[in-house]
């Protein structure tokens, strides 16, 4: 007997997004790195299935599991605001394969200045693409803004790494291994706000509970961007803090000293082990669809809401991005 899918809401989350565990399960699903390998035609099929489900025209014989799988592919590859297919490298599902390579090499090649500069540049190039790909698309970003953001973040990361390398020359070796994390954290504090500065200037689009646009709020933008910065630093922290401790001990073992050529691949592999868990955990720290009390909004926006709605509106909602 076929399941009745006429009332199936494909946009309803499978897990409770009001709880941390529910959000982690959700992001484990859509940041699955295996989806990066899914062919384009299958992604296009997923989009068609999602759109048909939204219109209530699901093909006969379709199973619920097929719709869940289609939604997983759709969420992993298509932007939540525009519905456009995102570039592969910028998708959150590419965070594990892309991040593990860059993190592993940043942690391995931290001693020489050219290596530090090169890998910080690679990392910031990757971050800039991810930030742009996962931005709140309701707030357009100009090419000039992207360029300024990219240059500023890269300069910050390199300056932090180079400066701390010089300061830690006489410090214990382990301290020097933590320099890449300090550079990454500092750059995230610059890169994300700079890339999304338009939202801070003009405000982020806020909606009512029925998804009707109300206006734009700079305060909401500041909250959303701050949460994204915290999430990104949290994503990198365990691997970039604990791996140096582990490698510092492993490199004292004789058999590890004999195979120095494998040190970098080992750090890449271990970085992947951390990221495969930390990407969904960090993304799930805060709800993607944020809820904000109207009383926190700008006074003029509060007045607009009071004039537009007869009944009191307690909260507004907005997509904070990833």
Curated annotation (Swiss-Prot):
Name the reaction it catalyses.
L-serine(in) = L-serine(out)
Give the matching InterPro entries: Mtc
The transmembrane residues are 100-122, 142-164, 174-192, 228-250, 265-287
UniProt KW keywords:
Acetylation, Amino-acid transport, Membrane, Mitochondrion, Mitochondrion inner membrane, Mitochondrion outer membrane, Transmembrane, Transmembrane helix, Transport
Q: Which GO terms describe its cellular component?
A: mitochondrial inner membrane; mitochondrial outer membrane; mitochondrion
Output one GO MF annotation: transmembrane transporter activity
Keyword flag Endoplasmic reticulum: no
Q: Which residues carry this modification: N-acetylmethionine?
A: 1
Instruction: State whether keyword Membrane applies.
Output: yes
The membrane-topology field of this record reads: Multi-pass membrane protein
Q: Could you provide one GO biological process annotation from this protein's UniProt record? A: serine import into mitochondrion
The entry sums up its family as follows: Belongs to the sideroflexin family.
Function of this protein?
Mitochondrial amino-acid transporter that mediates transport of serine into mitochondria. Involved in mitochondrial iron homeostasis by regulating heme biosynthesis.
**Can you say what this protein is called?**
Sideroflexin-2
- What gene is this protein a product of? SFXN2
């Amino acid at each position: 007997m076929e399941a009745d899918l006429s009332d199936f809401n494909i946009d309803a989350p499978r897990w409770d997004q009001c709880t941390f565990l529910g959000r982690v399960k959700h992001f484990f699903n859509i940041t699955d790195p295996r989806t990066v390998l899914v062919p384009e035609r299958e992604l296009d099929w997923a989009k068609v299935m999602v759109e048909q489900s939204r219109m209530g025209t699901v093909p006969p014989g379709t199973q619920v599991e097929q719709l869940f799988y289609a939604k997983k592919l759709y969420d992993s590859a298509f932007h939540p605001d525009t519905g456009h297919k995102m570039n592969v490298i910028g998708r959150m599902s590419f965070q594990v394969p892309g991040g593990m390579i860059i993190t592993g090499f940043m942690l391995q090649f931290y001693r020489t200045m050219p290596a530090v500069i090169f890998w910080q540049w690679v990392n910031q190039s990757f971050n800039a693409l991810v930030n742009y790909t996962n931005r709140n698309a309701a707030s357009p970003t100009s090419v000039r803004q992207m360029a300024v953001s990219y240059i500023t973040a890269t300069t910050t990361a390199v300056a932090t790494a180079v400066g701390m390398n010089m300061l830690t020359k006489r410090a214990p070796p382990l301290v020097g291994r933590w320099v890449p994390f300090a550079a990454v954290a500092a750059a995230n504090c610059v890169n994300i706000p700079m890339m999304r500065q338009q939202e801070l200037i003009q405000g982020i689009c806020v909606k009512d509970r029925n998804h009707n646009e109300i206006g734009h709020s700079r305060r909401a933008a500041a909250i959303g961007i701050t949460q994204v910065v915290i999430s990104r630093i949290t994503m990198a922290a365990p691997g970039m803090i604990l791996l140096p401790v582990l490698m510092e001990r492993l490199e004292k073992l004789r058999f590890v000293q004999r195979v120095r050529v494998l040190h970098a691949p080992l750090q890449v592999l271990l970085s992947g082990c951390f990221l495969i868990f930390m990407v969904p955990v960090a993304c799930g720290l805060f709800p993607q669809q944020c809820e904000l009390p109207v009383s926190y909004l700008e006074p003029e926006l509060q007045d607009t809401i009071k004039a537009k709605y007869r009944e009191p509106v307690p909260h507004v909602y907005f997509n904070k991005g990833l």
